[in-house]
């Protein structure tokens, strides 16, 4: 029988179950004290409860969750905490404040049906994503939440923004859980993982679900193999003797702002690649357009084709049927016998991609997805193998290096800063290093032998960050936000105290 805290978001009356002891607990205690004091000062009342959700680092399995494939992230200690209270006694407003002065208070109507103004990007929009998504889901479950009421909300997030560590998912997940808890509900974690993934689509990002699933389902001491359809998490104990170091390239990745040319562009390219593979492998164009959504949908056909050639590798079909040269819109429309906007259901997010794109690299995107999916299972199989910990760590590092090459060359989601940072990590003792998160900026993750972590961090700081400190790109006193080691940390929680 599964424990309740494995099924539902746990509710705690103290911080220790999540933050442990020592310096992490001291830091958390200070943050909660500041949140309570600031909440009282801003809103003239105390919060009813708190919710928190962590950021994450993806160890391997990049850009494949939205294609239906398993991924392998772990939660990090950096999180977003939200203090919240219902306001039955005031105008029906959502007042969303932040402990960081950089983010001014946002005010919205307490209306679950309101549209989000995507042309006017505000940090508070992420809370409205959660607000809308929660109400839609509660309604679909037949939960009566009564008439809309105002909410006072104070946010404290320490996941670096634009870092590839899922600051947006940590915010949306903690917001959804805070709203859920203040309305007296507690949905199952697997439901919340799906719900919060849908929430982020309100802000125009076609999220695959990994970031939300790990933020909600993580357990202290374990990475998680996250599977989709249905969402489930399998605990993975990493080999002894290794540690993960996370390093920010200092190039910020604004996923929601650049989506049409970067993140959402790749989603569309993968969809088009999968439909063309379906057609080339025997489906009628109309059938493929209506039934094929992801590359995992046509993997069976690709494997069957490979089987006829003495293999089980879906990449054979990619090599045979998708040309390496970029496709034009006209070439794709000729193969599929339909216009691209119609193929993509005239979806506004996809139309924005079509307006921004001049060509589509279908071969490269499909090759990345199928090879990266295989690497995830290679990572899992290595962890479960009978090899020595030292050999396991070497193999895991090799897989991380292969993953970065694929992300950089086939998926083209790296940037010059990430390339430099990954090389610095490898040149100075990392067993493996790769970009993590959506890419186009953000962080790299390096696998390092535990006994060498302190020296590794000092060397990377000297070789990559010192010149950037001198140029004023980053402050010396903020370095621990941008370069740190992390153990697998705890997932989402509710606090009542």
What are these regions (language model features)?
Residues 75-78, 165-185, 448-449:
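DPxDG-like acidic metal-binding loop motif
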């Amino acid at each position: 029988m599964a424990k309740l805290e494995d099924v539902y978001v746990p509710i705690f009356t103290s911080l220790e179950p999540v933050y442990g002891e020592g310096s992490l607990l001291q830091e958390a205690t200070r943050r909660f004290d500041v949140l309570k004091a600031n909440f009282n000062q801003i809103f003239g009342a105390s919060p009813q409860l708190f919710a928190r959700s962590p950021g994450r680092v993806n160890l391997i399995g990049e850009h494949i969750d939205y294609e239906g494939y398993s991924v392998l992230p772990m939660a990090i200690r950096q999180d977003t905490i939200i203090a919240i209270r219902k306001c039955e006694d005031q105008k029906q407003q959502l007042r969303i404040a932040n402990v960081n002065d950089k983010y001014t208070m946002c005010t919205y109507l307490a209306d679950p049906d309101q549209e989000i103004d995507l042309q006017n990007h505000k940090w508070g929009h992420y809370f409205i994503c959660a607000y809308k998504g929660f109400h839609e889901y509660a309604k679909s479950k037949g939960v009566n939440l009564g008439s809309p009421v105002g909410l006072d909300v104070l946010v404290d997030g320490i996941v670096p923004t634009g870092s590839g560590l899922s600051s947006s998912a940590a915010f949306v997940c903690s917001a959804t859980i805070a709203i859920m808890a203040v309305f007296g509900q507690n949905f199952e974690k697997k439901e919340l993982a799906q719900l919060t993934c849908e929430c982020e689509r309100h802000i125009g990002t076609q999220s695959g679900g990994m970031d939300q699933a790990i933020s909600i389902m993580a357990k202290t001491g374990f990475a998680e193999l996250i599977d989709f359809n249905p969402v489930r998490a399998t605990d993975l104990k990493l080999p002894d003797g290794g540690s993960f170091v996370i390093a920010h390239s200092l190039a910020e990745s604004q996923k929601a702002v650049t989506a049409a040319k970067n993140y959402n562009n790749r989603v569309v390219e993968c969809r088009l690649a999968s439909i063309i593979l379906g057609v080339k492998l025997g489906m009628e164009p109309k059938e493929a357009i209506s039934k094929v959504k992801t590359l995992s949908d046509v993997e069976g056909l690709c494997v069957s084709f490979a089987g006829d050639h003495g293999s089980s590798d879906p990449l054979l079909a990619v090599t045979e049927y998708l040309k390496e040269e970029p496709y034009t819109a006209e070439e794709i429309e000729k193969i599929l016998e339909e216009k691209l906007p119609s193929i993509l259901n005239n979806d506004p997010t996809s139309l924005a991609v079509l307006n921004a794109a001049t060509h589509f690299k279908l071969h490269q995107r499909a090759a990345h997805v199928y090879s990266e999916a295989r690497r995830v299972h290679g990572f899992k199989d290595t962890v479960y193998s009978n090899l020595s910990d030292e050999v396991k760590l070497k193999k895991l590092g090799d897989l991380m290096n292969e993953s970065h090459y694929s992300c950089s060359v086939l998926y083209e989601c790296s940037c010059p800063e990430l390339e430099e940072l990954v090389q610095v990590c490898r040149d100075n003792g990392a067993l493996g290093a790769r970009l993590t998160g959506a890419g186009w900026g953000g962080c790299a993750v390096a696998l390092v032998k535990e006994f060498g972590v302190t020296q590794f961090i000092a060397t990377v700081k000297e070789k990559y960050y010192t010149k950037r400190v001198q140029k004023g790109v980053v402050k010396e006193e903020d370095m621990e936000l941008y370069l740190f080691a992390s153990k697998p940390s705890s997932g989402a929680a509710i606090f009542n105290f």
